[in-house]
């Protein structure tokens, strides 16, 4: 199965060690990292007595907030383009940026679903989506949505899907649409489905060679 790996980037904002100990530290992170970052921050706060506060959202939304003056000390973006935009405003400490980890896109459905779908069978897909929608993060600016669109274009099925989208403000909201049964399918990150008992993975997305 071809894999779609998407690199995260990290940037540190000016904060001296003394200030770190006395103030709240804000981590602005892509919504796909909600579970991981929330647990890490909770454990860190409990062990140190410090106050690390995670703020989650679409990387595009977070980047805009940072550019507009939001008090971010750490930014973890789901793609490099939005990190570049923050960098262009000279808001990143020199030398602090690095590729941190990777993720993978998957097609999901409710655990109870009996609908069979194939991303490689246009006729099957058109039939399944008749009167239905597929949840993805907004492909106009959210990294998960941009990657999903690229993957669907690679499969040459974007023209058959683009009018059947339930677009979400971020990938976690797209996941919630499927969890609540509002849509039969969704495209999210593999990390979003970790520990979910009511969602199943149908297939993995193809690799996106040109994704930033």
Model-derived regions: residue spans:
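Bacterial N-terminal signal peptides
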Residues: 5-16
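N-terminal secretory signal peptides that target proteins for export/translocation
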Residues: 1-2
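Short active-site segment of divalent metal-dependent hydrolases/proteases
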Residues: 76
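Exported/periplasmic ABC-transporter solute-binding proteins
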Residues: 20-70, 79-80, 84-89, 93-103, ...
């Amino acid at each position: 199965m071809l894999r779609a790996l998407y690199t995260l980037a990290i940037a540190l904002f000016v904060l001296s060690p003394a200030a770190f100990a006395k103030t709240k530290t804000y981590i602005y992170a892509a919504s796909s990292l909600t579970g991981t970052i929330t647990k890490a921050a909770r454990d860190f706060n409990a062990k140190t007595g410090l106050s690390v506060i995670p703020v989650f959202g679409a990387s595009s939304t977070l980047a805009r907030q940072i550019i507009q003056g939001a008090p971010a000390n750490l930014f973890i973006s789901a793609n490099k383009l939005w990190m570049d935009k923050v960098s262009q405003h000279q808001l990143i400490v020199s030398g602090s940026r690095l590729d941190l980890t990777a993720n993978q896109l998957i097609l999901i459905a409710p655990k109870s679903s009996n609908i069979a779908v194939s991303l490689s069978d246009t006729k099957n897909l058109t039939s399944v989506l008749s009167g239905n929608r597929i949840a993805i993060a907004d492909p106009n600016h959210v990294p998960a949505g941009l990657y999903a669109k690229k993957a669907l274009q690679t499969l040459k099925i974007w023209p058959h899907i683009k009018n059947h989208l339930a677009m979400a403000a971020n990938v976690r909201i797209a996941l919630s649409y499927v969890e609540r049964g509002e849509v039969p399918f969704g495209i999210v990150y593999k990390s979003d489905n970790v520990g979910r008992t009511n969602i199943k993975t149908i297939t993995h997305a193809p690799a996106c060679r040109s994704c930033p």
